[in-house]
Each structure stands twice: as structure tokens, then as C-alpha cells.
């Protein structure tokens, strides 16, 4: 329990329906742990409902999270610590999500290797609202394969059915294992391990990260057969539905996996998926909107750079540099656009451009050209006034430079 407590305190996070924070957890345990422990051992402990939070999904719609109370988070973390070693050794080598020492990077590299080996068609399967649609009986039957303690089985089921509070009302839950608690990722892997074992038994090459599963085959016809048969397996065995609108049998370079895509060449180089670029641009625009009126250097240091650095770190596996060069240029243009807007009057623009080294004639022509901020931010006069080095001196990082730090010298 002490290890679970340390993990909960380290991860912090928002409070549940009781409003208690992780900083208040130790004091609560000092007062109430004896009673809580007794009810756990007696098999009578009743979790509180989770707090519902809806967050936007990158492709539209929302993802539903269920935030447990900090006490329930502690108990779930302890359960996770006990169950994880029991299952971990039996999980598939092709499963990468929510597992110790594994992650998205390994999954992406494994997917690339499958394509490079000649499997140049992908069965891209999207499970419809997976975390909201998990059948409790099917899941608990899988858990019971390795857990015989009826108290623990009952406690896990009560967590699954603990209800969800939204707008002051508690909704009963008959299905799903909402994301937000420590147990949910492990339970999802326990359920989908049946899928992994089925794919392995059939000899399929696949990569699965949580509910994101790609199967690699050598022809469209083979992919269509796999899509149909695996969809039937999921429906009949696990009572899960494949989202046909978001699933497809397609070339890997026309799909994305964990934010990445591939080039169509034989080498199948990793690249940033188009949608991932769009999402970054949307986030950058949000930062610019929230940072309007702030000192530019402070905005770059505190708001822009952390976002760019995290994005570059994740996509450092990309083997094509063009997208990073294009984004670097686009970000500088956004900054030039901000500065042009700040110079509201033509006379101010003229004076600033002169100070930045433009000739009198060129500064006048630019200041009174009547064009909009975005056009001017891409025009030569502002590129001369604000070259890349100007923003570098303000502390702006380069996405290309950041990712190149991870690239091996050729």
C-alpha cells in the first residue's frame, strides 16, 4: 500500500466526487484506514462513483473519463500492482500499450518493420467506443481465469459498476471501464489479450496499442478476409463492435498509427501523419490566442517552447525532415503576424521596419501596402526584418534541430 500511495501522490491529478486532493490523502488515511482496511478484507467495501469528465478527441467528438476519488485511486493502484505481474509474462510481444518498459515508440517501429518485410497492406481496426462498451461479464470471466479470491473479484466488479456522477446526478453503469483510473488500462489489456492470442494462433503479424490494432498482410484480398473474420471474433467472443466507418484495409502510407505514417517507398520510412501536423497547428493557434498581448520572449519561453519540445520529442522517430522545416517556417510566420498586428498604424510599421534595417522606400511601401497581417507575415519585407536568427535570439526552438538531436549520424 505504501508503494501504491507513493504512485498516487506522484501522479497527482484531479480529485473525484468528494473533492479530496492527493495532498489530503495521507491525513484521511491516518483517520480512516483501519475501517477501510477492515471493509476491504470483509469484502464489503463500496467505491464511490467516478466523476465524469468529457475531453475533446483529436478527430472530433469527446472521450469520456471517469475520475475516481483519491482513496479509490489508491486501492485501484494497489490492485494494479498485484495483478500486473500475474498477467504481464503472458501478454503478447505484439502488445505495447500500458505495459512496463513498452510504449508507442516500440509499437511504431514494430509496425514499420512489418511493412518493410513486405506486408504492404494494413487492416486498420477501430473498436467502437471501446472503453465505454466493455462487457463486464466477459471481462470478469477473463480476470477470473487467474484470480480466485472472491473478495477481489467482487471488488473489481464493484469498481466497474460504481456509477458515474455528472451534473450532480449519478448514472448507473452496466458496461464499460472508463479511462481515468489505474485499473482501466490493465483491464483493457486483459480483455484484448484474447484478441492477441487469436491473431497469434492464426499466424498474423500485428501491432496493438491499447484498443488501436493494426494487422499487416500482403494483399488487399487477404486484408478483407482478415477484417471480416476478426470482426466476427470480436463480436461473438468479446462482444465488441468494429467501427466500420473508421476501419479500413488500405496501404499503410494512407493510414496513421499512433500519430505516425510511412512513406510509400520500399524503405517505408517513418513520417509524421498529416493529421498530427494539423493537430499541432491547432494547438499552436490556441497558444497564440491565449498569449495575445504578452511579451513575445516570455510567450515563446513559457507557452510555445514546451509544446514544441514535447511534440518534437514524440516524433523524433520520423525519418523525413521536410515537415519539421515547414512547421518551423509556419511558426515564425505566425510570430511575424503577431508583431505586424501589434504595429497597428502604418506610421508605426514604417518606423519599426526602418529600425530593423529596411530602406526608406521599402519600409514605406510595406507599411502602406494595405494588405492583411497574414499576407504581410509571409512577404519578403517581414522575412528580412525578422529572419530566423531574430526568433532564435528570443529563445525559439527549432523543431528540426530538436528532432535531429535524436537522429543517428549517417
Where are these regions (language model features)?
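Non-catalytic terminal/accessory segments
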Residues: 1-410
Amino acid at each position: 500500500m505504501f508503494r501504491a500511495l507513493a504512485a498516487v501522490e506522484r501522479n497527482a491529478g484531479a480529485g473525484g466526487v468528494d473533492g479530496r486532493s492527493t495532498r489530503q490523502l495521507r491525513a484521511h488515511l491516518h483517520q480512516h484506514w483501519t475501517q477501510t482496511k477492515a471493509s476491504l478484507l470483509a469484502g464489503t467495501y463500496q467505491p464511490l462513483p467516478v466523476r465524469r469528465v468529457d475531453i475533446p478527441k483529436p478527430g472530433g467528438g469527446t472521450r469520456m473519463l471517469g475520475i475516481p476519488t483519491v482513496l479509490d485511486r489508491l486501492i485501484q493502484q494497489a490492485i494494479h500492482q498485484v495483478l500486473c505481474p500475474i498477467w504481464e509474462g503472458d501478454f503478447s510481444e505484439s502488445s505495447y500499450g500500458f505495459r512496463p518498459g513498452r510504449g508507442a515508440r516500440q509499437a511504431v517501429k514494430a509496425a514499420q518493420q512489418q511493412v518493410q518485410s513486405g506486408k504492404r497492406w494494413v487492416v486498420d481496426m477501430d473498436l467502437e467506443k471501446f472503453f465505454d462498451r466493455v462487457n463486464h461479464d466477459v471481462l470478469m470471466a477473463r480476470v477470473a481465469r487467474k484470480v480466485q479470491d472472491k473478495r477481489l473479484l467482487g471488488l473489481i466488479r464493484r469498481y466497474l459498476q460504481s456509477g458515474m456522477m455528472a451534473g450532480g446526478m449519478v448514472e448507473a453503469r452496466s458496461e464499460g471501464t472508463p479511462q481515468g483510473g489505474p485499473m482501466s488500462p490493465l483491464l483493457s489489456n486483459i480483455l484484448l489479450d484474447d484478441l492477441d492470442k487469436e491473431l497469434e494462433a492464426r499466424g498474423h503479424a500485428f501491432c496493438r496499442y491499447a484498443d488501436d490494432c493494426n494487422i499487416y498482410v500482403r494483399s488487399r484480398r487477404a486484408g478483407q478476409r482478415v477484417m471480416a473474420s476478426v470482426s466476427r471474433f470480436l463480436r461473438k467472443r468479446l462482444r465488441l463492435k468494429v467501427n466500420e466507418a473508421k476501419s479500413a484495409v488500405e496501404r499503410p502510407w494512407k493510414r496513421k498509427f499512433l500519430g505516425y505514417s510511412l512513406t510509400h517507398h520500399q524503405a517505408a520510412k517513418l513520417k509524421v501523419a498529416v493529421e498530427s501536423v494539423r493537430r499541432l497547428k491547432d494547438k499552436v493557434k490556441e497558444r497564440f490566442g491565449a498569449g495575445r498581448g504578452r511579451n513575445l520572449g516570455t510567450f515563446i519561453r513559457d507557452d510555445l517552447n514546451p509544446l514544441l519540445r514535447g511534440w518534437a520529442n514524440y516524433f523524433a522517430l520520423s525519418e523525413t525532415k521536410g515537415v519539421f522545416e515547414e512547421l518551423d517556417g509556419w511558426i515564425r510566420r505566425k510570430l511575424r503576424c503577431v508583431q505586424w498586428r501589434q504595429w497597428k498604424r502604418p506610421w508605426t510599421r514604417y518606423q519599426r521596419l526602418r529600425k530593423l534595417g529596411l530602406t526608406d522606400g521599402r519600409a514605406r511601401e510595406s507599411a502602406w501596402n494595405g494588405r492583411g497581417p497574414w499576407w504581410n507575415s509571409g512577404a519578403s519585407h517581414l522575412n528580412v526584418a525578422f529572419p530566423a536568427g531574430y526568433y532564435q535570439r528570443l529563445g525559439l526552438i527549432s523543431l528540426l534541430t530538436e528532432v535531429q538531436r535524436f537522429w543517428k549520424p549517417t
